[in-house]
Regions:
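Boundary at the C-terminal end of the N-terminal hydrophobic targeting segment
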Residues: 17-21
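Positively charged n-region of N-terminal signal peptides that target proteins for export
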Residues: 1-4
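Solenoid-repeat scaffolds in large eukaryotic assemblies
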Residues: 103, 115-116, 178, 185
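Bacterial N-terminal signal peptides
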Residues: 6-16
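Aromatic-rich carbohydrate-recognition surfaces in CAZymes
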Residues: 93-103, 149-173
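Aromatic- and glycine-enriched pocket-lining scaffold segments that form the walls
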Residues: 167-211
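Low-complexity, Ser/Thr/Pro/Gly-enriched N-terminal "stalk/linker" regions
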Residues: 22-98, 109-144, 149, 200-203, ...
Length: 211
């Protein structure tokens, strides 16, 4: 479900049109790339702030994008019971690993732990294979009304985004608040490079080329 990430990116890009201030000059060519990344420096670059936008305008735009996607009348996020939720591909009337994993990535970056945990619990229950040749992998499409898998196979971008989001969550919230995020991420990673071809299920990560 690529619509969620596309909308998030679109919302960020719309800052240039929606909150353009009269005193913000065209920033192109004025912002030199950093010599070191955030992983090394511990500082995450806010290019909109560097470009001259006000922090309150940036925050308001992000809050509006989150509201539209997760809370508003046209949301794609739906809660199930007391502790689960899924992201719907409204057009195709299913839930997909791309949508769930993108939703988790948005939740962890915006410090929405309850939303993150709800999405992950639904994912584990209805998408993740718990045994057999596909153990650790995810069914890429599920009917959210019945919980039945539309396809047993995986779409690797979902696996990669699940791992990334879980590692982010481990770093942000720790692993002793109800879900061991690191252990969950490690389980997926271990599955991604340990398949032996049984039933045609193969590694997602190429162990020879580390890709």
């Amino acid at each position: 479900m690529k619509h969620l990430m596309s909308l998030i990116i679109y919302a960020a890009c719309c800052l240039s049109a929606a909150v353009m201030a009269d005193d913000v000059d065209d920033p192109r060519g004025k912002m030199a790339p950093w010599e070191k990344g955030a992983w090394e420096t511990g500082q995450y670059r806010n290019v909109f702030l560097e470009a001259g936008y006000k922090q309150e305008d940036i925050d308001a735009k992000l809050a509006k994008a989150y509201y539209d996607l997760f809370e508003g009348p046209n949301r794609v996020y739906f809660e199930v019971g007391e502790d689960m939720a899924y992201v719907s591909d409204l057009k195709n009337k299913d839930a997909r690993t791309e949508g769930l994993s993108y939703g988790m990535m948005a939740a962890v970056q915006l410090d929405k732990k309850e939303v993150f945990d709800r999405l992950w619990r639904w994912t584990v229950k209805y998408m993740q294979h718990q045994d057999g040749p596909r153990e650790g992998y995810f069914a890429w499409s599920v009917n959210p009304e019945t919980g039945r898998k539309n396809s047993q196979g995986s779409a690797s971008d979902g696996e990669f985004f699940f791992v990334t989001a879980l590692l982010f969550a481990s770093n942000r919230w720790g692993n002793d608040t109800g879900i061991d995020y690191y252990a969950q991420a490690r389980r997926i990673l271990d599955a991604m490079w340990s398949k032996d071809g049984t039933a045609g299920v193969r590694n997602i990560i190429n162990t020879e080329h580390k890709m």
